[in-house]
């Protein structure tokens, strides 16, 4: 790989949109502010806007495509400066400083927070610094700091990486109880931000300090943590030590060609790049690429985002995949595979239950598959039966709407073509005018199928004058009958 333009160690490296940014560091024991961008695709370096504060031994992290440069060493002092670089605009801005000024630490991003753990801070007695167990958390969303549970064993010059949402703090140094050289440690301290608790994992096999660590994410290689290089007992290492979180064990990978410490390691598409550093004599501009254990053996990861495990009237097959493929296809109801390369509609599906799975094959022959999704198709409209009113005349203006629907649905009615009125069940209609009326009930089921049913009825109450006339006729008839009977009775008596 093309060497970095500016030889240096104690730098920070970060990846944004597939490009590596090498920032700051130390060269000839002087802090530098260089900011150089490396493009692995073109194997070219480009100068970018320097960091406002030249420093080394700082922590670096990426959040929301911006690079956070925090803390570090300037001369013989430790700082808490928090400067943020935006590659999209090639500009820097300053944010809230870290509460505890310190250096020789790392930054880890978990759940939108940046964790800065341990490191070294100023001491008033020789050697004028001490390791610290501070665990401070920066929230980029509101530019604020908070404190979490301290690391059990305070260290500086360690390496760290994140796997499965946990932060691994590996190796490092601590001052002895009496003046002298530093004590090197091989601990593997694990912090869980979700529980704010610490635990221990398998120790680093070969003790080292000022190495670098990074993790692969299962993109092209298995998810592993890599501890590379470092320094121990006047010896600079090129070892690659590989940690497997699945079984809490270490193994050994291919050694780095240039043994060194104070380097930076970046990961692009599960390929590692070891950049810069110090080999005991020279500040380095080395840029060495490492393809990790099992690289190229991991199948593509594909996930079906639509359909889900529910019922549909129309079905769109949509998916997410983590990298390019040579071929993709789906199998519906265990039938033959159908080739696809983008979102597609599944047409002519029968009523009822279905299953679907997607397969993806990469250029290396690795076949991946999604989970199987079970779903149902329902294209039938709800069936509505109106019991009342019926297609007839009614003498009352107070009408009860009574009906049934054969499935859960959103309900409404419309009277005489007016706007729909939402209801939840049977209801009494508003007072109606005399004459004919049209009533339609609507039902829309949970997947959008709509049905309707209409009845026609008439409001025709008996007129008041008609009733009075009938009563009068009956009264007259009764009176006439009475008089007739009375006269007949009188005639009989006279005879």
What are these regions (language model features)?
Residues 470-474:
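Membrane-embedded alpha-helical segments of small multi-pass membrane proteins
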Residues 475-486:
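Alpha-helical transmembrane segments
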Residues 295-469, 486-495:
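Low-complexity, disordered linker/stalk regions enriched in Pro/Thr/Ser/Gly
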Residues 27, 75, 84, 96-98, ...:
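Generic secretory/membrane-interface signal
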Residues 1-297:
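Kelch-like beta-propeller repeat domains
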